[in-house]
């Protein structure tokens, strides 16, 4: 869950273990502050790209493609990781699970990204590596889904066509 889930998923798992009369973690400012602190301390500065991401992203941008980032992490964490990799300027908007659009696999964040560029879902595609990414792409009705995976057998869902898999 920690690798494929969002902070919201982790919080929900912890909440289920707590006494029912305890303040929900989503409403607990102390918990929220501690999670922000831990994210800054442990996550920031530890971005590890899946191969050379800068070259293809720069090529897409130079060719006129508009690129957005949709993550189940926080916007702050995503922006910091992109900045660390030197590619933050390629993404607009950067949408996180904390942006008010819900998390993947819900389609709302992806639909917001598409609308931010004045496009329709059928004119967009999503590149991702998780079931949540694939689910968001399907729910939003984008034209296609490109999967980044170690191999065709490692794609997040069997409905992802093998020809849509780009090896890491």
Where do the protein language model's features map onto the residues?
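Acidic, Mg2+-coordinating phosphoryl-transfer loop and its flanking beta/alpha structural elements
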Residues: 125-165
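Conserved Lys-Pro-Asp/Glu-containing loop-to-beta segment of HAD-superfamily phosphomonoesterases
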Residues: 104-134
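Short, acidic loop-to-helix structural element flanking the phosphoryl-transfer center
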Residues: 4-8, 40-69, 75, 79, ...
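A metal-dependent, Asp-based hydrolase signature
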Residues: 1-40, 51-54, 59
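Glycine/Thr-rich beta-alpha phosphate-binding loop at enzyme active sites
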Residues: 93-103
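Conserved H-loop
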Residues: 88-92, 120
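Surface-exposed amphipathic alpha-helices with a cationic face
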Residues: 54-62, 114-115, 134-139
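Phosphate- and divalent-cation-binding pockets in alpha/beta enzyme and binding domains
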Residues: 77-80, 112, 136
């Amino acid at each position: 869950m920690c690798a494929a889930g969002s902070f919201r998923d982790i919080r929900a798992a912890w909440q289920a273990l707590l006494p029912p009369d305890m303040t929900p973690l989503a409403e607990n400012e102390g918990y929220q502050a501690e999670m922000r602190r831990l994210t800054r301390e442990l996550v920031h500065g530890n971005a590890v790209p899946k191969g050379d991401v800068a070259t293809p992203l720069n090529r897409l941008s130079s060719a006129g493609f508009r690129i957005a980032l949709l993550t189940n992490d926080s916007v702050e964490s995503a922006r910091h990781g992109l900045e660390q990799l030197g590619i933050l300027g390629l993404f607009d908007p950067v949408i996180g699970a904390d942006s008010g659009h819900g998390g993947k696999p819900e389609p709302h964040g992806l639909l917001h990204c598409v609308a931010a560029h004045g496009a329709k879902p059928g004119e967009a595609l999503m590149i991702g590596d998780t079931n949540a990414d694939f689910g968001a792409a399907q729910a939003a009705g984008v034209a296609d889904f490109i999967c980044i995976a170690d191999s065709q057998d490692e794609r997040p869902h069997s409905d992802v066509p093998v020809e849509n898999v780009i090896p890491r």
